[in-house]
Design a protein with these regions (language model features):
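Domain-level signature for proteins that mediate thiol-based redox and metal-cofactor handling
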Residues: 1-157
Length: 157
C-alpha cells in the first residue's frame, strides 16, 4: 500500500528540531478559512483532535491529521510535506522561525488507489493507544522517491 503522506528531509529535520524545542507535536491540515490547506504544527497539548479528523500517518512520533472534509478532497492524493521560507501570519509553531510547512500532492495511480481502497479507510478521531502502537512500527527518515520510511500509512483495524 502506498503511503498517503511523505515528509521531505528538510521537513523531517525541522519537525525534529521543533519537537526538541517544544515537546510532542501534532500536525493538522484543515483547509480552513485562515490558513487554507497549509499543514499546521502544534504542541500536542495545544490541539484537540476532532472525532471526524483523519489520521494520515505518523512521522517521527508526530501524528498527522487532516479534517474530514479535506480528507474527502485529498483521499486519492499522496501528500508531500516540505518547508519553504516565509512564515508570515500563522498559528503554526514554525512560523516564528521565518519558515512554514507546505504540502504538495500527486494523484495516486489506479493501482495505488485500488490498494488503498482494499486496505479500508484510515482511522478517525483521537487515537492515543493506537498512535502508540503505530509509533512502534515507524522508522525515522523519509524523502520523496526513497522508500518512504518514517511515515506509517494508517488504515482501519
Amino acid at each position: 500500500m502506498p503511503p498517503r503522506l511523505i515528509f521531505t528531509e528538510q521537513a523531517l529535520a525541522l519537525t525534529r528540531r521543533l519537537r526538541t524545542e517544544h515537546g510532542p507535536l501534532i500536525f493538522h491540515l484543515s483547509g480552513g478559512c485562515c490558513e487554507g490547506s497549509a499543514p499546521m504544527c502544534f504542541r500536542q497539548s495545544d490541539f484537540r483532535v476532532g472525532p471526524r479528523d483523519v489520521l494520515l500517518g505518523m512521522v517521527d512520533d508526530c501524528p498527522f491529521y487532516v479534517g474530514a472534509s479535506q480528507f474527502d478532497y485529498w483521499a486519492y492524493c499522496q501528500l508531500t510535506v516540505d518547508v519553504t521560507e516565509g512564515g508570515g501570519d500563522s498559528f503554526s509553531i514554525e512560523a516564528a522561525d521565518g519558515v512554514r510547512f507546505i504540502v504538495r500532492s500527486r494523484l495516486f495511480t489506479d493501482e495505488e488507489a485500488a490498494a488503498l481502497d482494499a486496505a479500508g479507510p484510515p482511522l478517525r478521531g483521537p487515537l492515543p493507544q493506537r498512535a502508540d502502537a503505530a509509533r512502534q512500527q515507524s522508522t525515522t527518515t523519509s524523502q520523496p522517491g526513497a522508500d518512504h520510511r518514517g511515515v506509517l500509512p494508517c488504515r482501519s483495524r
